Amino acid sequence: MAAKDVKFSTDARDRMLRGVDILANAVKVTLGPKGRNVVIEKSFGAPRITKDGVTVAKEIELEDKFENMGAQMVREVASKTADLAGDGTTTATVLAQAIVKEGAKSVAAGMNPMDLKRGIDLAVDAIVADLKAHAKKITSNDEIAQVGTISANGDNEIGRFLAEAMQKVGNEGVITVEEAKSLDTELEVVEGMQFDRGYVSPYFVTNSEKMRVELEDPYILIHEKKLSGLQTMLPLLEAVVQSGKPLLIVAEDVEGEALATLVVNKLRGGLKIAAVKAPGFGDRRKAMLEDIAILTGGTTISEDLGIKLENVTLSMLGRAKKVVIDKENTTIVDGAGAKKDIEARTQQIKLQIEETTSDYDREKLQERLAKLAGGVAVIRVGGATEVEVKERKDRVDDALHATRAAVEEGILPGGGVALLRATKVLDGVKTANADQKAGVDIIRRAIQVPVRQIVQNAGEDGSLVVGKLLEKDTYSWGFNAATGEYQDLVQAGVIDPAKVVRTALQDAASVASLLITTEALVADKPKKAEATQAAPAMDF
């Protein structure tokens, strides 16, 4: 086992604090609408330019192991906030730095770290309750666009695209962000349910110009096994022909005689038909087939349920307004499933999302939920250079998470004002002793720091602005760093999602409390470099 280096009390906290400062000082310059860029060297390719706090935090690794511990714990604040709220990482880092700094001073002055922590927890609970009480639910598309714009560092175009995407696919819909091949940013919306399986044979194509199958008002047969012969299906096919409607077959596979017969019938014009393979694999395939059945109002033809293909009637088939199939994807638009069944299914998937511990499973469940709830939107981010595209994509990702958070828990005035206004609530917090009161005061000073930093990054005097803001009682009145004016921030569109502000404060206080109550640090001792032996002489 390698020898360890151990540091105690003040020495340990000082080392950690240095690491906290290095990381937080690099991150906090990105805060606010006038936040500066940070350039990160990459071992290959062009350097990366970003204004995203968590991206900067993840790149920082310090040589001194004790300093690095402090830096990594604050990095954890940024990562946790990014995971939970998707934005607010820089605010969380700035808050953590402020709480640790103030806390370290109090501990050095001889106060009890555990009582300080209790005081911090009491203050945070009071502020969270205040934030929830003041949060305003989002009602209009404009407000969604404003949240997106603020999170994207004032980029109106990004805010507009996000609002449009959320309007089209709903709050539960999947919105993905990709890099575009062109200069322009564009939005593509796939309405209805889309899955990544194309037609089994190109002979099914009805639109030869676009090489795709288009079926209007079709019946949909959902079968979980392979189809290799059509003998058992003949009664059903005859009923479909008589109805005059097209038929889509979704099965594990369609092969051999079955495929040949279907293609021949299609080419002769007797039967408008197409076949696709079922999406997914294993248990996920069963679940996705059931989703399609519920969406279209049909029944999954499965031997588990005791339904044989020869007994299937038209009433067991699903219906949709339109189905479009190309080489790679199938899209079912406007399925005829009962609304209450679809809602029950989405509720069931939501419960599974809450219970699952696997990130991969969660992602797949969210995709299924979105397909049932209304569709998928893709925002393709354009730019003149690869560096610019990557930087914009970072901002779009941030903005997307922020808008989702805003829809979830409502909005608050931005610019750090919501936290600043919460100082009043702290006057009513009851503490058991002087050290706990000092913990409350640590938070009182820390929640002023985001406003100061935003103002400082905009080139103004932070203390002056904070003093001016505290003179006035109006909750949403604040300093708009983008324009340099004092105004009602909610009316001006300077807003933050309540979830982002709340998560940033809770995560910062949680990790900062741990740093304050740390009494010893243990790290591996650096190994001394062994002297290399001289190479033997080569005088042959």
Curated annotation (Swiss-Prot):
Listed binding positions for ATP are 30-33, 51, 87-91, 415, 480-482, 496
EC number from the UniProt entry: 5.6.1.7
Q: Which domain of life is it from?
A: Bacteria
Q: Does the keyword Isomerase apply?
A: yes
Indicate the enzyme's highest-level EC class: isomerase
Indicate the principal place this protein occupies in or around the cell: cytoplasm
User: Which UniProt key words apply to this protein?
Assistant: ATP-binding, Chaperone, Cytoplasm, Isomerase, Nucleotide-binding
Which is one Gene Ontology cellular component term of this protein?
A: cytoplasm
Biological processes per GO annotation: protein refolding
Q: Which PROSITE patterns match?
A: CHAPERONINS_CPN60
Example GO molecular function term? isomerase activity
Reactions catalysed, semicolon-separated, are: ATP + H2O + a folded polypeptide = ADP + phosphate + an unfolded polypeptide
Q: Where in the cell is it found?
A: Cytoplasm
The answer, when asked if Nucleus is one of the entry's keywords, is: no
Q: Name the SUPFAM superfamilies for this protein.
A: GroEL apical domain-like (SSF52029), GroEL equatorial domain-like (SSF48592), GroEL-intermediate domain like (SSF54849)
Which family does the similarity line name? Belongs to the chaperonin (HSP60) family.
Q: What does this protein do?
A: Together with its co-chaperonin GroES, plays an essential role in assisting protein folding. The GroEL-GroES system forms a nano-cage that allows encapsulation of the non-native substrate proteins and provides a physical environment optimized to promote and accelerate protein folding.
| Subunit structure comment from the entry | Forms a cylinder of 14 subunits composed of two heptameric rings stacked back-to-back. Interacts with the co-chaperonin GroES.
Put simply, this protein is called: Chaperonin GroEL 3
Species of the source: Bradyrhizobium sp. (strain BTAi1 / ATCC BAA-1182)
